[in-house]
Amino acid sequence: MRNEKRKVQMQSAKLPLKAVAIVALVLLAVSSAVISVDAHMPGAKPLPEFELEPISIYDGDTLIDISLDDIGDYHGEICVCGGCAFRATQLGISKILGDEIPARDDIKIVSRLPTPGSRDCFQYITGTGPGIETKTKGEYKVILPDGTAVVNLSNKDLKKASNDNTLDNFRFEVCRKSTGECFEVVLKLGVFSEDYFELRKKVKFGIPENATSEEKALFKSEWEDTRDKFLTSPDWELFEDVEEPEEEEPDVVGGATFLLILVIGLILLVALVHSRKKAS
């Protein structure tokens, strides 16, 4: 009888241990899923070589140059959204001010894109983010395409708002507050592959189901290609309402004139030499 009681006690002791093990495995799986959502792009290939001019602004009476590397350091890496936000700000400022350098507190950016990468870029440029040493501050807002204002800009809330992102979210108003002038920077169709946002939902959020290993690999490749476009492609390949500069036509008239002068010079030289020989 005592042996039977001991067996029952041992079995009952094993049950909680099994339950604990199962719970631990579930928590591990959940934590792994969270890591995959929070991570930028584990194992992404290195950045290509690129040359992008910095964004120059006046912070009070101090002229500062903000490079894409500065944005990457602030955010943690150069990502798709950070690269896009940087290029969009560059373009918007140039469209409104030309070669004039803006004051930081005269810049207002209204973004339709609720992502941590774009947030960190815009906050760094406007001086509105945490941990930025600045004398002045511009203005930065996130307003979704349907008009909803995203007030909480924490990573958690931005990611929640971003699970339905489409190309329509990649629109940014860059404004000069003192004059009210604004230019809306709109990303072109084709910068993202057709299945990019569908794959993003599966990989990052498990919507409508978890991504397969093949889909994860495909999304990683498309993510890398898109990131690299924002580093190396000209504005007219990325954004609407930007005309490709015309190639300079060869100066046919100038070339013909030069050739004619050269021929005349040679004729005169030959005539001069011939006349000297005749005189001697």
Give, region by region, the residue ranges found by the protein language model:
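Non-transmembrane, aqueous-exposed alpha-helical and coiled segments at domain scale
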Residues: 38-78, 86-249
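Secretory targeting signatures
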Residues: 1-40, 248-280
